[in-house]
UniProtKB/Swiss-Prot annotation:
ABC transporter involved in zearalenone production. InterPro entries: AAA+_ATPase (IPR003593), ABC2_TM (IPR013525), ABC_trans_N (IPR029481), ABC_transporter-like_ATP-bd (IPR003439), ABC_transporter-like_CS (IPR017871), ABCG_dom (IPR043926), ABCG_PDR_1 (IPR034001), ABCG_PDR_2 (IPR034003). It is a multi-pass membrane protein. It comes from Gibberella zeae (strain ATCC MYA-4620 / CBS 123657 / FGSC 9075 / NRRL 31084 / PH-1) (Wheat head blight fungus). It is found in: Cell membrane; Vacuole membrane. Induction: Expression is positively regulated by the zearalenone biosynthesis specific transcription factor ZEB2. This is ZEB2-regulated ABC transporter 1. Belongs to the ABC transporter superfamily. ABCG family. PDR (TC 3.A.1.205) subfamily. Glycans are attached at residues 7, 70, 73, 118, 332, 469, 714, 1402.
């Protein structure tokens, strides 16, 4: 689909005139080491300072001519026009990205020539940095906050607000960095996690949020100062993080089209428009990264199905590539890619550097040698110290000259990284006392070296060639300005104009809607259904006074439904915030442009929804049947939607975290509802809070709709006093009776609508259009606040990486303590390996034969695994390898019995016997994702696994002692009591991986250990440490099967056996690897492959042999070759032997029943341990507990103060009823707070603990429910105290002499409400995947229950069809019990405006006239002795009011009992629904053994 264009048709003459003087290529001359073949490098080295303008112009013209000539020379293969390049129709053309013959290098040369000839070449920028020091501020306290100790941080918080950095100490991150990266060069940044690689890349690219750069630091970007480059040219230096953040519902093609269009230069070659250019660039980049086939596939994320993880990573890379930034920083961007794709990524960067002069700084973990060889320079960082910077091909020699030795088959990047690991670096004989040991010593040696002096000389040369703000800076600015849209400021970092940005974001917004139309359609259907249900409750109201309350309730419901239809936009804003901020850093668009576009994108939905909902409600309820009134109703309703949308969007944009937004939003919603004027009319609002009504947009909308409905109409009276139906009053008429409705005039049989709303609500016709104007002003103001706040307020950033401890387990010295972190000498003794002696070993052999796995994908059967054979024996370490998509993890899941769908066939045996129900518990499965409970400590996580998964017969003390053994084995002593936390504030990546392995080891798996991708995303040093650990375990007798992603040669050599899979899950090889991989390589050579060259990585060589590496090809069917080989026959023979031996030695399960139980621990112990952990999670999440407490206290106090000392008048009784009604509305907020914590625990349980048979699903559900009860009990006390006494319910009880019982029962009922809420939340979330979906489901049921509980419409006023809903609604019984307990057995005192006025018959007093009536119908007179103007109150006792609502004080305990039954139903329902929806039933799973 073509991208939209706006104001993009600037003429070619305008573009030409503006870009006539633009420098097309790299205008800088050579430094001492020239950039690698960048276009335009062949230039004079006479870079003069700014001189006369004419001389400068002549010089620039000369440069342009030279560069054009240079481009022609380097692009001689392409002689066509620009149209030939962008419209290459030849399917075999190497310039056509859709062609199988597409050649990236040929295209790049042609592109450079085309753009150069038209004076619109590529900007280039190098970097010189000198004396670079980067630091941050770290808090002295790094203990875990919990409910008990969170208050201890308050003094520090106050102090920090006064002086932000006063209570923090400076932590140096990088110290003393110097270097030059010339334009067109590539620099690889090496170092272990935490060494400062990311900080370095962020600093040089301007991503300095949370870190600070010393004032003494010198930056020079080809003459551009750092401040200007990072602000005015932000999109020219970009930082690409390792995380993949995209709109999941957007297709890959649309994602990349957007990126290409956002940075599309305006000065394009003749005949090429912006859409053609953008789509062509998108296709080229997708072809370069091998993702052309995903163009119409959704990107997806962890929850939404889309492209694979590796493809999503390449989408991230492609998006950054399309930014066309001349200076690019890539932070571990190859994470998740195998070595072949990592190499292709680096080759593409090399191509860009050579032909476009782009400069790249790249940090790579486990960099293949081939990738490293593509770089010009290397930077090695050791704990924040620069220990080498210079030519990449000289780095290895530098460290060898320092006295270190590079082992055979170790790659150069691994060798360089090993310099930062004392346990890995190898010292040459005779150099033991000469080599540096600590980071400071390495840094000092670097500063003393000859290489450093060369760097210093290069820096000085660079400074003289590119003086700050010199001619090269001017040329850069001109080139950039020529690419910008017409009218853009030079200092603006954006290519497109603001309106073009809005238009582009608008296009993307509609593409996102098209990507997930189901959500929008479902919302429209759901809202229309709610409209039908609500309308049926007030169906076909008559123009009579008896429906006044229903008519007001209908309009109130309409106002609230329209006003709060946009409440969930808060969640939407936070979900897309990281994406918007990332793309703003790329200078794609202003955040406010996306905000403005999002408002417009939502308009069609808002308009459609508003029409469907309001038309349904208006006509079904029989509101004012006047055309003008109807369209006014639609207008006000729609403006209400927009006004409140602006409010919710503003709240989201003004707060940095979702938790910051939710509590204010909850209170705001409550305040807007109460002060709208229906629940509490204006006259009844207390003075301290009257101002809220003036700021409430809902109030203005409600008043306008009430005036629209009632003004200018007369309503027939349906209730007179005295009533003609009472004997003796049948003939009463005229002035001797009056309508009992507010606004009635004695003698009239109708009530004027204006009089009613004037007296009851203080609403006036003159305010009708005034309020519309106020609403429009509020709408504009709210949206302006939203747009401005979006531009300037960013989301909260993570802190620096720091360990967090329980306060009682804090280490004696803080991490930042200089003494604690002082350098220590390298230990000279080898580590004792005897610690593995106590680790559980395996004695069983696990073997499988002819394993196949078939599954239906989009209705089509697909085979994922195809006749896979193999075994794992005790004491062996077996590698499972294969290309991406070969089914490695799938095979692991099949073998570990973790597949719940599809069809699995084949034999999977343990010592010749079929796997039983205990198999999962008796094996360990180390997953690729490191899933742990954030609030637990390392020791607690290990102990939890040990207590529940080790046999019940093992004493508890022995299990705890075994946990200590595991901690020692994994070298986790230093952080054994640290909290898991989240990345950045807790364990780092390596520590999490060790914990993941430790949790499985703590279970003492007696059979074997499955390990999935243990080194994925880790640096080579950490990967080596993880393999060290696995090797220790195998030597201790463990059987280990491990999938691994293209290991280095040295890592690969550490495995004993290999199972190698090709695409489609077909076996290529299974057998020994052999010394120096000779057994493996000999097999392939024997069957027709080339010899493995010396020094080549066998893991990479295998991929090339089978034709799986990019650019490789083979004519040999290696799967069939394996099936025909003698090695395969030997495997089959061994499998038959294992099966036969196992069957002969089989042991009856009855002899050792405990070993074969599904769960190791009994049910009671499971429940105790699991519940304790949930309690700990809640205690250590003070934000949840205090947010819940704040909500209950603030809502309770707010209601208590708003309805303070509510009188026992008719309106006072209604206010007390609404106080109870509004209290129930905290249901939604409590549910939204609770569900995310449940989802966190459930994710951990379902992904790791349930498949491992740690504890049963019944225990999981019950532990979650039990842990909520004490906290909700505490909250009920807060809510009770804050509402019961301020509102005055206690005074009603005192009047009746029932203080103790009614006070106690009121607390019990409030407690019951909160327990009902939490148990219902568990039932709702049990069947949904996300907290948002669960919250929506719960709110739908809550709204239905609230509608039909008898408050908005009494049961006798409901349509007969809905009586069943009244009876099944749990709130029917709750409201009845609470209201009757609160107000029963008290006398009513009508307010003056509630009294009905009429005259008695001639010659009688009011008392004599009404005596018979009062005896029959109730009520009382305030002036019984008067002979005129009788003042009559229709209700004397609160029990009469209760009866009208079908409530009775006598039913209070019955209703309480019914409420308890609902709670039991919730609990049983939660358990049943979880079992029904989320527990695997294995219906489709078939196995043959």
């Amino acid at each position: 689909m073509a991208l939209p264009e706006a104001n993009m048709s600037s003429t070619r003459s305008e573009q030409s005139s503006r870009s006539h003087d633009t420098i097309v290529g790299n205008e800088q001359p050579h430094s001492e080491k020239p950039a690698a073949s960048a276009p335009g490098d062949q230039m004079s080295s006479d870079d003069e300072d700014e001189g006369p303008q004419t001389e400068e112009m002549i010089r620039r013209h000369s440069i342009v001519r030279d560069l054009a000539r240079n481009y022609t020379n380097t692009s001689h293969h392409f002689t066509g026009s620009s149209a030939d390049l962008f419209n290459a129709a030849d399917a075999n053309s190497p310039l056509n990205p859709s062609s199988e013959n597409f050649n990236a290098r040929a295209w790049a040369r042609a592109m450079a020539k085309t753009m150069g000839e038209n004076g619109s070449g590529f900007r280039q920028s190098g970097l010189c940095f000198q004396d670079m020091n980067v630091f941050g501020y770290g808090a002295e306290t790094d203990y875990q906050k919990d409910v008990g100790n969170v208050w201890l941080g308050l003094p520090d918080m106050v102090h920090q607000m006064i002086s932000p950095n006063a209570n923090k100490r400076r932590i140096d991150i990088l110290r003393g960095f110097d270097g030059v990266i010339n334009a067109g060069e590539m620099c690889v940044v090496l170092g272990p996690p935490g060494s400062g690689c990311s900080t370095f890349l962020k600093s040089i690219s301007g991503e300095t949020n949370g870190i600070y750069i010393d004032d003494s630091t010198y930056f020079n970007y080809n003459g551009i100062p750092a401040e200007e480059m990072h602000k005015s040219h932000a999109g020219e230096t970009i930082y690409t993080a390792e995380v993949d953040i995209h709109f999941p519902m957007l297709s890959v093609g649309d994602t990349l089209t957007f990126a290409a269009r956002a940075r599309c230069p305006q000065n394009l070659p003749p005949g090429i428009d912006h859409n053609l250019y953008s789509e062509h660039m998108r296709d080229v980049v997708m072809a370069m990264y091998g993702i052309s086939h995903t163009i119409n596939t959704q990107v997806g994320d962890n929850y939404i199905r889309g492209v694979s993880g590796g493809e999503r990573k390449r989408v991230t890379i492609a998006e950054a590539t399309l930014s066309n930034a001349p200076f690019q920083c890539w932070d571990n961007s190859t994470r998740g890619l195998d070595s072949a794709n990592a190499i292709e990524f680096c080759k593409t960067l090399r191509l860009q550097s050579e032909l476009f002069g782009q400069t790249c700084a790249v940090s790579i973990y486990q960099a293949p040698q081939t990738a490293y060889d593509l770089f010009d320079k290397a930077l090695v960082i050791y704990e924040g110290r620069q220990i080498f910077f210079g030519p990449a091909d000289e780095a290895k020699a530098y460290f060898i000259n320092l006295g270190f030795e590079c082992p055979d088959r170790q790659t150069t990047p691994d060798f360089l990284t090993s310099m930062t690991a004392p346990s890995e670096r190898v010292v040459r004989p005779g150099w033991e006392n000469k080599v540096p040991r600590t980071p400071d010593e390495f840094h000092a040696r670097w500063k003393e070296s000859q290489q450093y002096q060369i760097v210093r000389a290069e820096i000085e040369s660079y400074k003289s060639l590119y003086p700050l703000n010199g001619s090269s800076a001017d040329a850069f600015r001109e080139n950039k300005h020529s690419a910008q849209a017409k009218g853009q400021r030079l200092k603006s970092p954006f290519t497109l104009s603001y309106m073009q940005q809005v238009q582009l974001c608008l296009w993307r917004g509609f593409r996102r809607l098209l990507g997930s139309p189901g959500v929008t359609i479902f919302q429209l259907i759901a809202n229309t259904a709610v409209a039908f249900i609500a309308s049926s409750l007030f169906y076909n109201m008559k123009p009579e006074t008896g429906d006044f309350f229903k008519r007001g309730a209908t309009l109130f419901l309409a106002v609230l439904s329209n006003a709060f239809a946009s409440a969930l936009e808060i969640l939407t804003q936070y979900s897309q915030r990281p994406i918007v901020e990332k793309q703003a850093r790329y200078a794609f668009y202003h955040p406010s442009a996306e905000a403005f576009a999002s408002i417009l994108v939502d308009m069609p939905y808002k308009i459609t929804n508003s029409i469907l909902f309001n038309v349904t409600l208006y006509f079904m309820t029989n509101l004012n049947r006047d055309a003008g009134a109807f369209f006014f109703f639609l207008l006000v309703s729609f403006i209400m939607v927009l006004a409140m949308s602006g409010v919710f969007r503003s709240i989201a944009s003004l707060s940095r975290t979702l938790s910051q937004a939710m509590v204010p939003a909850s209170l705001l919603i409550l305040a807007l509802v109460i002060f709208a004027g229906f629940v509490v009319p204006v006259d009844y609002m207390l003075g301290w809070c009257r101002w809220i009504n003036y700021l409430d947009p809902v109030a203005y909308g409600f008043e306008s709709l009430m005036v629209n409905e009632f003004s200018g109409r007369n309503f027939t009276c349906t209730a007179f006093v005295p009533n003609a139906q009472i004997p003796g009053y049948a003939d009463v008429g005229g002035l001797n009776r009056a309508c009992s409705t507010v606004g009635a005039i004695p003698g009239q049989s109708y009530v004027n609508g204006d009089a009613y709303i004037n007296l009851e609500y203080k609403y006036f016709h003159a305010h009708k259009w005034r309020n519309v104007g106020i609403l429009i002003a509020m709408t504009i103001f709210n949206h302006v606040v939203y747009i401005v706040a979006t531009e300037f307020i960013s989301a909260k950033k993570s802190k620096g990486e720091v360990l967090v401890f329980r306060r009682s387990n804090m280490p004696s010295k803080a991490k930042s303590d200089p003494e604690a972190s002082s350098s220590r000498p390298i230990p000279t003794t080898e580590k004792n390996n005897n610690e593995v002696a106590n680790i559980q070993g395996s004695t069983s052999v696990f073997h499988w034969n002819d394993v196949c796995y078939d599954i239906k994908i989009k209705g089509e059967p697909r085979r994922i695994l195809d006749h896979v054979d193999g075994w794992v024996k005790p004491g062996t370490l077996t590698a499972l390898m294969g290309v991406s998509g070969a089914g490695k993890t799938t095979l692991l899941d099949c073998l570990a019995d973790r597949i719940s769908m599809g069809v699995i066939t084949g034999e999977m045996l343990v010592d010749g016997k079929i796997r039983d129900s205990s198999f999962q518990r008796r094996t360990g499965y180390v997953q690729q994702q490191d899933l742990h409970l954030e609030t637990s400590t390392v020791r607690e996580a290990l102990t939890f696994s040990a207590l529940l998964r080790q046999p019940a017969s093992t004493p508890r003390e022995e299990k705890i002692a075994y946990v200590d053994e595991v901690i020692k084995l994994l070298d986790m002593q230093e952080y054994a009591d640290a909290v898991v936390g989240v990345l950045g504030e807790g364990l780092n990546v390596e520590q999490r991986k060790r914990l993941t392995i430790g949790v499985e080891l703590a279970a003492k798996p007696p059979l074997l250990l499955f390990v999935d991708e243990p080194t994925s995303g880790l640096d080579s040093q950490t990967s080596w440490a993880i393999l060290d650990l696995l090797e220790k375990l195998s030597k201790a007798g463990q059987s280990i099967l491990c999938t691994i992603h293209q290991p280095s040669a040295m890592l690969f050599q550490r495995f004993d056996r290999l199972l190698f899979l090709a695409k489609g899950g077909r076996t290529i090889y299974f057998g020994d690897i052999g010394k120096n991989s000779e057994t493996l390589t000999n097999y392939f050579v024997k069957h027709g492959s080339q010899e493995c060259p010396n020094g080549e990585n066998p893991a990479e060589w295998m991929l090339e042999v089978i034709g799986a590496a990019p650019g490789s090809h083979t004519d040999i069917d290696w799967h069939q070759t394996w099936r025909d080989s003698s090695e395969y026959q030997a495997v089959q023979t061994e499998l038959q032997r294992l099966k036969a031996e196992g069957s002969a030695n089989s042991v009856d399960q009855k002899s050792d029943p405990e070993s074969y139980r599904e769960f190791a621990a009994p049910f009671g112990q499971q429940l105790l341990i699991a519940t304790k952990r949930v309690f700990e999670q809640y205690w250590r999440t003070p934000s949840y507990i205090y947010s819940k407490a704040a909500l209950c206290i603030q809502v309770g106090l707010f209601l208590g103060l708003v309805f303070l000392n509510a009188p026992l008048s008719l309106r006072g009784l209604q206010n007390q009823m609404f106080a109870i009604f509004q209290m129930l509305t905290v249901f939604g907020q409590l549910v939204q707070m609770q569900m995310p914590h449940f989802v966190t625990q459930r994710s951990l349980y379902e992904v790791r603990e349930r498949p491992s048979k740690t504890y049963s699903w019944k225990v999981f559900m019950l532990s979650q429910i039990i842990a909520e009860i004490p906290w909700n009990t505490l909250m009920s006390v807060f809510l009770f105290v804050c509402i019961y006494y301020p509102v005055g319910f206690n005074k009603n009880a005192e009047f009746a002499g029932q203080t103790a019982e009614r006070g106690g029962l009121m607390w019990l009922l409030i407690w019951q409400f909160l327990i009902f809420t939490c148990t219902f939340a568990h039932a709702a979330i049990a069947i949904t995947d996300t907290a948002e979906a669960g919250g929506n489901l719960a709110n739908v049921v809550f709204m239905m229950s609230l509608f039909f509980c008898g408050v908005l419409a009494a049961p006798d006023k409901m349509p007969g069809f809905w009586i069943w809903m009244y009876r099944v609604s749990p709130f029917t019984y709750l409201v009845s019990a609470i209201l009757s307990t609160g107000i029963a057995n008290a006398e009513v005192k009508c307010a003056a405006n509630e009294l009905t006025t009429f005259n008695p018959t001639n010659g009688t007093t009011c008392g004599e006239y009404m005596d018979s009536y009062i005896k029959a119908a109730g009520g009382y007179l305030t002036n019984p002795d008067a002979t005129s103007d009788c003042k009559f109150c229709t209700i004397k006792s609160t029990n009469v009011y209760l009866k009208a609502l079908s409530a009775s004080y006598d039913d209070r305990w019955r209703n309480f009992g019914i409420g308890m039954v609902y709670i039991v139903v919730n609990i049983v329902g939660a358990l049943f629904l979880y079992w029904l929806i989320r527990m695997p039933k294995n219906k489709n799973k078939k196995k043959t053994a």
